[in-house]
């Protein structure tokens, strides 16, 4: 039996419930979920800052999550390289991923003979800390209000 392979990608810097929701959703679409974790250098180029957690630690944490079968580091040369190697049946984009829109990604992959289903996750359950940025803001707020003592 051929397994249906699902791939998603992200930074995963400061894991939070939103990450977990995307990963559960992605796993529900197939038999095998492989996650591409962004390299530190790539994050710096896209977000203008290095991630807080180093890439290998982020990869290990993501791979330890129940929905994930395997986590790999992305390519420094070509963002599409891991996708071209993995040949997924489904690609899941997070709600805030803007590097590619669905149509552009389809067109790029078609040039290589790949035609995966591309799905954008839209089902965030709103919770107080569904983004790394919200977590950092709350830590700063509590620290400034002296609710956190170091």
Swiss-Prot record:
Tell me the name of the encoding gene.
Answer: ribL
Gene3D superfamilies attached to this UniProt entry: HUPs
Q: Which organism is it from?
A: Methanocaldococcus fervens (strain DSM 4213 / JCM 15782 / AG86) (Methanococcus fervens)
* Database matches in InterPro entries: Archaeal_FAD_synthase, Cyt_trans-like, FAD_synth_RibL, Rossmann-like_a/b/a_fold
Named in its record, the pathway it takes part in is:
Cofactor biosynthesis; FAD biosynthesis; FAD from FMN: step 1/1
Write down the top EC class of this protein: transferase
Identification of the protein by name: FAD synthase
The family note in this entry says: Belongs to the archaeal FAD synthase family.
Q: Which GO terms describe its molecular function?
A: ATP binding; FMN adenylyltransferase activity
Binding positions (ATP): 11-12, 16-19, 96, 124
């Amino acid at each position: 039996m051929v397994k249906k392979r699902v791939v998603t990608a992200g930074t995963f810097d400061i894991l939070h419930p939103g990450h977990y929701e995307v990963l559960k959703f992605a796993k529900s679409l197939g038999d095998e979920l492989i996650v591409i974790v962004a390299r530190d250098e790539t994050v710096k180029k896209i977000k203008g800052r290095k991630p807080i957690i180093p890439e290998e630690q982020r990869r290990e944490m993501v791979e330890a999550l129940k929905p994930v079968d395997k986590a790999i580091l992305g390519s420094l040369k070509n963002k599409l390289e891991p996708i071209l190697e993995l040949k997924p049946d489904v690609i899941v984009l997070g709600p805030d991923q803007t590097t590619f829109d669905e149509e552009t990604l389809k067109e790029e992959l078609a040039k290589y003979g790949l035609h995966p289903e591309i799905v954008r996750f839209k089902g965030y359950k709103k919770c107080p800390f569904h983004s790394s940025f919200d977590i950092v803001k709350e830590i700063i707020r509590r620290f400034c209000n002296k609710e956190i003592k170091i």
